[in-house]
Design a protein with these regions (language model features):
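Active-site phosphate-binding strand-loop segment of PLP-dependent enzymes
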Residues: 1-43
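A short beta-alpha structural unit
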Residues: 19, 120-124, 159-167
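Active-site PLP attachment segment
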Residues: 55, 61-97
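PLP-dependent aminotransferase class I/II
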Residues: 80-147, 152-155
């Protein structure tokens, strides 16, 4: 940011929740940096919308920085029903510009109406009640408690991502395959997705 001061625009882009370990971005500190260096803030809420925050409205809610974030992106394929597609929203002047200049927006197909309808209904449900969010976080706590009691190493997190650390790429792959045989969808991650020392499903 210091080196970019001569540039016309500066932007800090971050995930709200980092998918490999469930760490939550410190949005209060990021927004302070942006204000100090006159930069825009863009946050990808793909793993945080519907999950993080007192009512599941994402990291902007968690850190109370709604008016300090300029651009939000997210997916409709996770907390909002597991469908497809995504969204970009934010300050009006930025969105108006993106509607004219964003090649992925201009040259792609629209999301199917049924997916739009289901996603809008999910947004409405989350806005009207925190019951789904509360149930999710209770399930996460239960899962973590039982896995830790069974002797597994799970990284602490404020999100719903529970990284089970196995520290061996082959074991990670075998573990994930066995879980899928049992009807439980698990993905094993290992180098280069993770540091060489920390493969996990």
């Amino acid at each position: 940011l210091q080196e970019a001061q001569a540039q016309r625009h500066r932007i800090i882009a971050t995930d709200g929740v980092f998918s490999m370990d469930g760490n939550v971005a410190p949005m209060d500190k990021i927004c302070e940096l942006a204000e100090k260096y006159d930069a825009l803030v863009m946050v990808d809420e793909s793993h945080s919308a519907g999950v993080v925050g007192p009512t599941g409205h994402g990291v902007a809610e968690q850190y109370n920085v709604y008016g300090r974030v300029d651009i939000f992106t997210g997916t409709l394929g996770k907390a909002f029903g597991g469908a497809m597609g995504g969204f970009t929203t934010g300050k009006k002047e930025i969105i108006d510009m993106l509607r004219q200049r964003s090649r992925p927006y201009l040259f792609s197909n629209s999301v199917a109406p049924a997916i739009v309808g289901a996603s809008l209904e999910m947004f409405k449900m989350l806005k009207e009640s925190d019951a789904l969010h509360t149930k999710l976080m209770n399930n996460v706590s239960y899962f973590r408690e039982k896995m830790l009691a069974a002797g597994f190493d799970i990284k602490p997190t404020q999100s719903a991502i529970c990284a089970v650390m196995l520290y061996d790429a082959k074991l990670s792959q075998d573990f994930a395959a066995k879980m899928q045989e049992e009807g439980i969808y698990v993905t094993g991650f290992y180098y280069p997705c993770l540091l060489y020392t920390s493969p996990s499903p």
